[in-house]
Amino acid sequence: MAKLRTLFDKIWDAHLVDVQDDGTCLIYIDRHMVHEVTSPQAFEGLEMSGRKVRHPELTLAVADHNVPTTDRSKGIENEESRIQVETLEANAKKFGVEYLRMDDIRQGVVHIVGPEQGFTLPGTTIVCGDSHTATHGAFGSLAFGIGTSEVEHVLATQTLVQKPAKNMRITVTGKPGPGVTAKDIVLAIIGKIGTAGGTGYVVEFAGEAIRDLSMEGRMTVCNMTIEAGARAGLVAPDEKTFAYIAGKPRSPKGAAFEAAVSYWKTLFTDEGAHFDAEVTLDASTLVPQITWGTSPEDVIAITGTVPNPADIKDEAKRKAVERSLDYMGLTAGMKATDIAIDVVFIGSCTNGRIEDFRAAAEIFKGRKVAASVQALIVPGSGLVKEQAEQEGLDKIFIEAGAEWREPGCSMCLAMNADQLKPGQRSASTSNRNFEGRQGRGGRTHLVSPAMAAAAAITGKLTDVRSL
């Protein structure tokens, strides 16, 4: 009888090139995405050793971290940022890699561009020098971030040295109630298992609540798997997956597509296959979630209160909570809905897709951004921007008093002009709330797009269900 295998096992086994006695593996990489921050030294290493990019057709380059989201005719003002983008373009040209320029409508955040272009396909291995590469796992691919030296290795050989991971399944049952989105589900998961809960694992997301998510929602969930410490996150492909991929520029066409779908339908976990760890969550019990502290595991319900260190017996945890409260400028026991906001950011590889902007627009429609709030709405790609404008979403945002920007990573991280000032507090749809993540001294609360829009309207963290 054939061994029962998980989805991860099937993809891993199909890509094994070699296994060493100590268990170290060499795996084949199907797709490689590169951006301006982690690729310069990798290309430089190739040049110094006289190597070529082994498979330029399997590599896609796009600048996203450093690009401005305001007037692009002025170029990039910060010299270091400008040099990184110029270097990526020069390297792509030199090594024959397709590069999506800033003036290309396809340009955007790397993890939004890949799926849009049909570069992301089920059953493939996908890497990028970026921690949120797990996003692509929503398509039933094995996708994970790698370091700069590994970027060079993949460019040169189209392979990667890896140790196999353990299997974890997170089953999300039930139907989410009003105001509860994919972002709330993944925040609740991280709040439950912690930022080290997934360490050493590849996580498969399963269950009714995951199946019911759109592809955009599944990407949001897989995107934040890394925040639970996991190597990657993935969802078995289904008819929603195939429909999303069909007709994309780089996806198979005609008979090749039908053949691909036949293979993709084999990409599921065999019934009875072994998982090293199992976690369950009932989505029907959730309300909208927020983070209160400086770690993605610092999650509470919007109806809840900020924790009180006095209630925590473990000294290390108590001190961590005290430090977070101090940095965040919060008092123990205060209501989540009493936390005032200065800036709202809707965008990023977590929530920068058309579905996210539709959800935000529903809240903004007929309302005004609070006078005390700056609201930045940043589409994840030029194609998302175009579609949002065709649907008139940009007009809703602008009429509400929000800023409709050009695509890029923007305020997700302090690598471009969009940054929090010291002491400013944001409601952000991004993925990390570390100290200084959005700017030195900035304070970040992670929320869904609808919750971010609600905060923009009221000037404080607000239960979107009340609007």
UniProtKB/Swiss-Prot annotation:
Enzyme class of the recorded protein, top EC level: lyase
Cofactor(s) in the UniProt record: [4Fe-4S] cluster
InterPro entries per UniProt: 3-IsopropMal_deHydase_lsu, Acnase/IPM_dHydase_lsu_aba_1/3, Acoase/IPM_deHydtase_lsu_aba, Aconitase_4Fe-4S_BS, Aconitase_4Fe-4S_dom, IPM_dehydratase_rel_enz, IPMI_cat
MF GO annotations: 3-isopropylmalate dehydratase activity; 4 iron, 4 sulfur cluster binding; metal ion binding
Gene3D superfamilies recorded: Aconitase, domain 3 (3.30.499.10)
Family: Belongs to the aconitase/IPM isomerase family. LeuC type 1 subfamily.
The protein's assembly and partners: Heterodimer of LeuC and LeuD.
Protein's recorded name: 3-isopropylmalate dehydratase large subunit
Gene responsible for this protein: leuC
